[in-house]
Amino acid sequence: MTEYKLVVVGAGGVGKSALTIQLIQNHFVDEYDPTIEDSYRKQVVIDGETCLLDILDTAGQEEYSAMRDQYMRTGEGFLLVFAVNSAKSFEDIGTYREQIKRVKDAEEVPMVLVGNKCDLPSWNVQNEQAREVAKQYGIPYIETSAKTRMGVDDAFYTLVREIRKDKDNKGRKGRKLNKPNRRFKCKML
């Protein structure tokens, strides 16, 4: 069974823990208790393949930023979560993305942009803004509500598909690099 190491990142209070707990335990946690770091595991079937999701729910608070490099090194894919009612959390996404790329030393890392709290009546980040940023980054955008469970499975499953796509692409490039060059001519004497 394939295991996927997923990391949920974003500013404090955007609903990272609520999304993760909704996926793992099918219930909504409405009290806010800042996370330092929690790890969850769940077996799921995605596109006919049984796999194990190893999900790291991270601290959004700035005082825990020193821990980020470590979990970014071990993660295979990242959910970049912002709250649609917080323009600041949306602006912070770029910082998380750049830090992930720096730590992973890669231009392309599997990521999904997630706009959470879509059940709220007023949004400070419009759908079009988020779609435009996701398009610039070349990553999918999923709207979620941890409260109503809207888009929760979709966000995590889309990230697994992005990791698979990334592995396939790297595998193809690796095979091309390993092919010996057989363009030599022989002459019979």
UniProtKB/Swiss-Prot annotation:
Output one GO BP term.
Answer: signal transduction
Q: What is its EC number?
A: 3.6.5.2
Q: What is this protein called?
A: Ras-like protein 1
Q: Can you list the disulfide-bonded cysteine pairs?
A: none
- Gene Ontology MF term list: G protein activity; GTP binding
Its chief place of residence is membrane
Q: Please give, as recorded in its UniProt entry, the membrane topology of this protein.
A: Lipid-anchor
Lipidation, S-geranylgeranyl cysteine type: 186
Q: How is its activity regulated?
A: Alternates between an inactive form bound to GDP and an active form bound to GTP. Activated by a guanine nucleotide-exchange factor (GEF) and inactivated by a GTPase-activating protein (GAP).
**Species annotation:** Drosophila willistoni (Fruit fly)
